[in-house]
């Protein structure tokens, strides 16, 4: 039996966020009433995968039990992957990253590769903060690929991967089952989970936030109430599916920002059954229940929060994943686009589709921008003039768009690649230079 990545998945999904799931690809493969029986059904091995400390509070504890044909330890020793290293996971003062400028930064999309390039080969780190070794902060990567991973499997020991496809579907085989992900959806692959990516559409491009710290969770809703934003039922986790395949395969690991490879004689997608709450999942951003003002003013962008990684300071997240989806704007006598802003947090933005309502041009799908701590940003000159003269007595729908933001509590440090690449727009600052002076002390 194999996990055929050439066609869409058929096993289906389990609904809910971080639920206590139980699923089996063969009847009776899950042990009854215990996790580690003396002899597991079908001659399987029982293996626990822990995503948090054993002693984490029950409400935060994440782990799963896997019942597999061979344990994960069965592979040859790892050795470093040779060739250029485009991944970075250390962003402290001693890290090999250049000084972070206070300038607003913006990039054109990552070009598609000319040579055959799979998902792992197409990764490049644009920015980040903290340290993978210290398990805090994040790295922000882009990917551009044009071929499926062939007899090759990958996992990151550095953090969980929040994948935001911009172009091309991803058929992702994991130890837990299949995830089929398309643009407008996201996928989260937990730290340590082995996976492989097939590209059914050929070219694929997108964004990744690799979270080194506390696991992503749904935010509390406060006075919004018991429903709204990203609803738990819309998160989908794969049902168990396995393959029993032997051959000359390669296992690639990411540890402390470095890639390592090992020979492995079988597919690691040999989990016949599993139960627990530590597993991959996907979410359709088009299902986000957008909240907004129906009187006046533009609320803070925290109303667009999908997922958060909490810090040790209450109310201050290490990472926020925020989206700006299609929505109605109805506020009267209000400047409706996102306002001019300086932020104690740092903001890395991407665009999946369409246009962003604060930028008339220059910010295109697949591109990115970075506005670091206290760097002034906001609508460009054309957007400001149009929005200042628009009729706000009528509602307006912002359509054909899907922008997002990775917002962090600490400085986002661009890598040497990000500052040297030809995709960096040297003239980004010009979009604000045409903003005119309107001040007249004689006219209120």
UniProtKB/Swiss-Prot annotation:
Keywords: Dioxygenase, Iron, Metal-binding, Oxidoreductase, Phenylalanine catabolism, Tyrosine catabolism. Disulfide bonds: none annotated. InterPro entries: HgmA_C, HgmA_N, Homogentis_dOase, Homogentis_dOase_bac, RmlC-like_jellyroll, RmlC_Cupin_sf. The keyword Coiled coil does not apply. One of its GO terms (molecular function) is iron ion binding. Homogentisate binds at residues 356, 377. Its cofactor is Fe cation. The active site is at 298 (proton acceptor). Pathway: Amino-acid degradation; L-phenylalanine degradation; acetoacetate and fumarate from L-phenylalanine: step 4/6. Its EC number is 1.13.11.5. It catalyses: homogentisate + O2 = 4-maleylacetoacetate + H(+). Fe cation binds at residues 341, 347, 377. One of its GO terms (cellular component) is cytoplasm. One of its GO terms (biological process) is L-phenylalanine catabolic process. Involved in the catabolism of homogentisate (2,5-dihydroxyphenylacetate or 2,5-OH-PhAc), a central intermediate in the degradation of phenylalanine and tyrosine. Catalyzes the oxidative ring cleavage of the aromatic ring of homogentisate to yield maleylacetoacetate. Belongs to the homogentisate dioxygenase family. Hexamer; dimer of trimers. This is Homogentisate 1,2-dioxygenase. It comes from Burkholderia ambifaria (strain MC40-6).
